[in-house]
Swiss-Prot record:
Signal sequence region: none
Protein's UniProt keywords contain 4Fe-4S: no
InterPro entries according to UniProt: YBL010C/LAA2-like
Region described as Disordered: 1-72
Localisation: Cytoplasm; Nucleus
Biased composition (Basic and acidic residues): 49-58
The organism's place on the tree of life at top rank: Eukaryota
The keyword Glycoprotein belongs to this UniProt entry's keyword annotation: no
Keyword set, alphabetical order: Cytoplasm, Nucleus
A GO CC term attached to the entry: cytosol
Protein name per Swiss-Prot or TrEMBL: Uncharacterized protein C8E11.05c
Pfam families: YBL010C_LAA2
Amino acid sequence: MASPPILSRESPVLGLEEEKKSDGGNSEVNIDPSASSSLKEDVDGEEGADTKIDPHLLEEDDLNPVEDYDSKNQKVVEASKLDLDATSTVWAESLSINREASISQSGIVDNEMEKKVEEEEEFDEFDDFGEFEHDIPICTFMGDWQDDFQDAVNSVFGLPETPKTIEESSLDPDRILSLWQKLIEMPVLQRPDWLRSSIRHIFLVTMGLPVDLDELLPTPSTQGSFNSSRTIELSSVTLPKSEDEPYLDYSAARRLCSINKDALTHRSHESLQQHIELLESTLQQAVEVARYWTDKRDSALSDKLLYETVVDDLVQHSKRLRNSGRKFLSRRSTSSHK
């Protein structure tokens, strides 16, 4: 069933109703013919659109096709007023229902919040009861029970033994230290001599080549004694200082050489004069030392040449003696065979 049409305030029917209310209901209603014709067309159209009006709201004269237009219009207005009242009541009821539902829902939420607050208060009360401050016990071993504890430990493990005294050794610590230093000392490594090596000798023998026996190295025992006699630590050797060697302070000379130009710019004239005198004296000492060591070097070179010539003469003399001895032995052997 289609709902009855709702008339707006701009409709001519409601306009008539408002005019009646403003006149207090005593003035007569003047209907425009054009408005009445349009209203009639609207009513006819609504009736053609299956618009039904509640029959008990209309009187028996409304069902009569021949009726006065004014009375019919008044009845339509009353029916629309009834419809408006019905819709307003329905709207008010829906609002009241929604309000009650919201009130009930808010009441439920409030109840839940109260329950949560009560639970939290109960939990807080329990938590306050559970957390309490207490003093941390301090373990101390000072008491009457310490002696009893020590007696019990001694009865189980026995009395503690006194440490044994170490007798003084009869060995000399200085001698032990010197032996230890020799033991941990790195050996002196020498460059291998390929011409006198045994590997070269074996290689030449296997290849069938002639070998000079004088080029062979001595036996390992002889080699060890030879090396031990030849290896001398230079740090343990102190050269005797000659009497005629001039004196030179090498540390002072190095300090003078390290002074730069910037350090001399801020000095006074007197300090610069003293510095020049010190430089001249140091330079004179250095020249004397250089001349002395140059002479020593030249003398050492001359001695070296002399020793080399002597050694060369001795080698040549030994070769001549060897050759003469071989010739003598060969002559003697030939004479004996004859």
